[in-house]
Amino acid sequence: MQILIVTPEAARWTAFGEGLRAAGLSCSFAGAPDDLKAESLKADRPLLVLWDEPYTGDALRAAGIGVIMADARINQSACTDEGHETFHEKVEGLGFLPNVPLTRTAEDARALANSLVKVSAL
């Protein structure tokens, strides 16, 4: 199962990617929200789209809605230093999983995998 990470800097996700692989997941990267086309999301549906920290606030909501419109079965999360409640308020109603901290460690990846288990995605 694949996690699609939308980030301008894939290199900063190395440890996180190792944690995903240890949890039986793989990851791929897109450089920007515009790289996510509805057709490609439908043809090669990722388990989760993970938005990196540059995509926040209204831009994150808009990008998240775009993914939902392509395929509402795709889970989403974002990498941010916001507290859980603040993050939840910004993406309320979009079904985002808990945010990933900026540390992007293997442990953070395992926590995300556990969240996917809780929503029965794995």
Model-inferred region functions:
Residues 86, 104-114:
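C-terminal output helix
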Residues 46-71, 81-84:
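Conserved phosphotransfer microenvironments
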Residues 7:
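Conserved acidic carboxylate
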Residues 80-100:
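Alpha4 helix (beta4-alpha4-beta5 surface) of REC/receiver domains from two-component response regulators
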Residues 114-122:
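The C-terminal output helix
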Residues 31-48:
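Acidic, metal-coordinating helix/loop segments flanking the phosphotransfer/catalytic sites
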Residues 10-30:
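Two-component/phosphorelay signaling modules centered on CheY-like receiver
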